[in-house]
Amino acid sequence: MSNLSNLDNLFAPTVQAPIQEKELIEWRPSFRNAPNKTYTAIVRFVPWWQDPSNSILEKFSCYLENPYQPNTGRTVDSPSSIGEKDPISDTYWLLKNSGNAINVENAKKFSRTQKYSMLIQIISDSVNPKLNGKILVWRVGKKVYEKIATEMTPVIAGIQPRNPFDIINGRAFVVKITEASGFNNYDNCQFVDIDKSQSCLKLTEKQEDGTYKFVEAVSETSDKQKVFDFLQANSPDLGKFKYQPWDEETVRYVDSVIAFYTGRTASGAPAQPIASPQKTASLESI
């Protein structure tokens, strides 16, 4: 990899991200938004200028419905993301292994999802062409992550590993999202070989109409500082997608949800009787 490709001497974890105007920072492609229920785009992965060694941020989270207020809830990051004890996961297994059908069903309410967040630059978006050239955060599940991992560490002998975050040599990623049982299906997404001038990082300028004008295809002769300044100014703050520790309000909320379904708080202390005990079986005997 060239010196320009990794920019290690310019990336600075201690440098604060610039204050950005409120605008679209996350790419959320879905078959639901596409003609014929097939969303197609070409993207390239972009290193996180503040910490390139952590250009993929992984975490578990859970959407906890509020049992006291129907149709409300909040997403809570799982402490297991950083190897800490997780009351949400503990409650899931407590209910799952209870042997009671109602509790087993309620365990689903504490099921976690695993997401990987990273930066991408849109090369071509057939559904939202105004995004072409823009750098956004893309949160993906295990299917896309495994394709990235295989690109970096091939499972077949003889295939050379490639770094998709290499701003010059990283391959383009074709996104083709179809529908499968009402969900997004990523089976047809893949890395492809296209001309390097098309797949490399592009320096762009935002126009008055909201589109992005391509200024320069980054190459070995590009000015390092110019490239770094572009990434710093145009990349959303990926740090916002890291695991977020629980504040006191989150602790109280999680405790209240756990107490509703188990009769005890996350710490194991007895809770007040729930308002609708018929919604769950008692766990005091478990």
Language model: regions and residue ranges:
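OB-fold ssDNA-binding interfaces and closely related basic DNA-contact patches used
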Residues: M1-F165, Q244-R252, S256-A259, I286
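Compact mixed alphabeta submodule
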Residues: S124-T280
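Terminal short linear interaction segments
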Residues: T280-I286
